[in-house]
Each structure stands twice: as structure tokens, then as C-alpha cells.
């Protein structure tokens, strides 16, 4: 794991600030990747490869980056917004990082190894019926069989999963990349599809700030920002942390997410002095034994769901976050669709 993590870190740094030697070596592979990705999409759009349509509208929320765009809070915000408008929403996802390959409809006993950390987090935050599976269509069928009153499905991270037809496509794009001219496809860059793909989606949500003035891939552009909530105790979520009591304590922050620096910065922006930070690979397994010794250990919500059976120590705290999307993305989605049934 350490060597793999180190190599992945080097590649991610290259994606942010390209190294000439690596670019020379990886550029031909990116060209090959581009041809394969383009052919695959063309085959589905032309009907050469079959795609499946579910009996309810499907809204895909994805990205053309290989993760790290802040998509999960945006999916949660969209689902919550649709629920507030009376729509019975379901969520489907691949369930990346889970140990089982079978389709799984989440329930109160579901764990991260059954569902994946992000789907489990979405399920717990929104209360929306959720199913995971490598085939999104199969996951959707299972979800509708278990919850036939669902009127709309949000497909998390399914932009490139063309085997499932979609009624609305939403792409999340990081604000930090809107002014860049050196973006490239995998493996030389972090893109799964070229920037031109943004021209064909229904909406683009720029995450983490304002877009560059020249970035206008879609006439329907939204912006999202992350707001930190009140830190709560992992063992007792109703107990809120008084951050003032941390003044003379040793605080360690642990994050197993794609962009851990954002999490660490959020804590510092709250006035918390972090003695040490621990960055783990995205979706990494984590247990109580992996947590460092400190007066207070603060973790992400995404990591918190991995402790499904609780934890024996009382010094672990969780920082919740939510995405604020402007203008109203849920209203936009409903305008694009017709006759979405409302919950009774």
C-alpha cells in the first residue's frame, strides 16, 4: 500500500503541475485512451451497443475528472432539494471500494464494505432509498423493486456509464481547473473525457469557487460552495464539540478522501490548531487501530461511516459538510423533466 500510495501521489501532483518528463512518457497513452473513450460513447449513442432505460426519469450527476471534484456533497444537496419539493428520490451508485460485487439495496444495517463509503454516506444523510451495483441499470431495477413509489432516480458518478440511459446529465467541474490550459486525459491528466464533453451535458456545477470568466461550457452553469457544520462526537452525534476546549489539547485530523487538504483547511479556518494531519488514500479502509493517539481526533463524514459498529474511544469527532448550490439545481432538474410524481 505505501508504494502504491506514493506512486499515486506523484501522478496526482503531475496532474496539478505537469512534469515534462512524465508528460513525454504518458502523452501517447492519453491519446490512446481518448480514442477508446470516444469510440465507446459513440457506440452507445449510435445504438451499436445497447443501453437500458428505467421506467422512471434518471438524473446522472458525474464528472469528467477521475474524482476529487466535490461531487458527493452536491449529490446530497440535489437529492435533499428534490425531496423538499415533494419528489420521492432514489439513489444508485457503483459503490466503489466495497468488498461485495452483488447488487445491494441499502438498509439500516448496511456497512461500508457492503455499499461503499460514499453511497452509505448519501443514504444516511438524505434518507433516500439507495442501491449499489456495477451495473447501474441492475441497481436501478433492484431499487425500484424494493421501493416502487420512487418517482426519480439520481445516478451518482454515472456520467460515463452509458449502458444506462439518462434524462438529465449534470457534470461537476472544479473551479480551480476552469482556467487551466494543460488539462489532459488519463493517464497524463486527470480527465476521463475531453473538455468538449461538457458541451453536451444539461448543466455544469462549478465546485469550490467561481469559474474563470472564459469558462462557459454550458448555458446552464451553477456554482457550489461547501459549508462546514458543527463538529459532533462519533459515538454520540447529538453531542456537539465546543471547539474552544481544544485550545490546549493535541488535535489530529485524519482524512481518507481525494482532496484531504480541503478538510484540513476547513478545520484551520474554524480556528482549530491541528497538531498533525494524516492523509489516507481515497476510500481507504480505516479502523480504530489506525487512528493516532491524541486528545481529539477529527475525521470526515465519509470516513465516519466506516465505523458502522461504533468505536470504543470517546476522542473521535466528525466534521459534517454540506454543499450550497446556486441557483436552485433541483428546480432546474424538475423543469427539464415532465410529470415527475410527487410523494404522497
Swiss-Prot record:
Keywords: ATP-binding, Kinase, Lipid A biosynthesis, Lipid biosynthesis, Lipid metabolism, Nucleotide-binding, Transferase. Pathway: Glycolipid biosynthesis; lipid IV(A) biosynthesis; lipid IV(A) from (3R)-3-hydroxytetradecanoyl-[acyl-carrier-protein] and UDP-N-acetyl-alpha-D-glucosamine: step 6/6. It comes from the Bacteria. InterPro entries: LpxK, P-loop_NTPase. It holds the Pfam family LpxK. It catalyses: a lipid A disaccharide + ATP = a lipid IVA + ADP + H(+). Signal peptide: none annotated. It is an enzyme of class 2 (transferase). ATP binds at residues 65-72. GO terms for cellular component: plasma membrane. The keyword Ligase does not apply. GO terms for biological process: lipid A biosynthetic process; lipopolysaccharide core region biosynthetic process. Its EC number is 2.7.1.130. GO terms for molecular function: ATP binding; tetraacyldisaccharide 4'-kinase activity. The keyword Transferase applies. Transfers the gamma-phosphate of ATP to the 4'-position of a tetraacyldisaccharide 1-phosphate intermediate (termed DS-1-P) to form tetraacyldisaccharide 1,4'-bis-phosphate (lipid IVA). PANTHER family: TETRAACYLDISACCHARIDE 4'-KINASE, TETRAACYLDISACCHARIDE 4'-KINASE, MITOCHONDRIAL-RELATED. HAMAP family: LpxK. Belongs to the LpxK family. This is Tetraacyldisaccharide 4'-kinase.
